[in-house]
């Protein structure tokens, strides 16, 4: 069987992690099939039996050309006649094949959010939420299967696209096991209670919820609120509206801006903290939640489906309704006296083996 894999835009962040996990799965479960992997320049291309790599340029408008006509032209030039096309980049392509499998991991396309049209993020959200689903529909057919990471994404995608649920498989991604013995203790400011929120400065990450929450905490227990420190993986100025609110309400001492933090240091900070705060309203998975739970760190998060699914079985999570700032403040104050919990371990799941079965045999196998 000839299988083509599309990964030309999987060169950074979470998409690159997924691609690397796929390569490991390919080495173990690729079988005797003929694999053609299409990648961007500079991406990992380890030597694996029966695997050939092809470098393609698909940035910007070239991506659309590739999806609709470019890929079809390339495989014709190379004399490749695919039986299966597996896409790691959320959409399919136009070509002849017996089966198409799409790995979908873009929550913005299926989640409603009230966006401030003046924000830097507005164009990104409007593109992914309104245009992207239309684009996806143009590149799926009755031979298409879709792989997702959580049931939340499965249900949302099925509803958004009108796509049959029985052709969507759920494959929880592999998460790196943390060696706690290698994590050094992080020294926070003495006589303070330190919380951490590792997130990028996108509007839907709802950092400002934490500013409102700390302000509410002062109304409930001002002496304890003075000792609260919220550590952010942002630089001052990345979220001007929040910066202004913090300044106007005299909360400067409560917020610590660290900028980008190396992952190992971040894990040390999470382990040594009094709790992980996670007010984000749009997530495909929410990896920091899993990392905090695996360290036994208390978690305060929005009462949303993705949080319940990811942290199902963890005793150390407290849920708060979205935008209930008074309750957020109360939970943060309560967490100041909380101890750590028993570390949470995910149940074993042979997700990549199951996904490879979908690619090679067209079978959706539940865990």
For the regions a language model picked out, list residue spans one by one.
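Conserved donor-binding/catalytic core segment of Leloir-type glycosyltransferases
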Residues: 4, 187-205, 211-214
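Membrane-proximal helix-turn-helix segments that form the acceptor-binding/catalytic region
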Residues: 124-146
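Short hydrophobic beta-strand element within catalytic cores of glycosyltransferases
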Residues: 292, 298-301
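Aromatic "clamp/platform" in nucleotide-sugar-dependent glycosyltransferases that forms part
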Residues: 281
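Conserved acidic donor-binding segment of nucleotide-sugar-dependent glycosyltransferases
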Residues: 317-326, 334-337
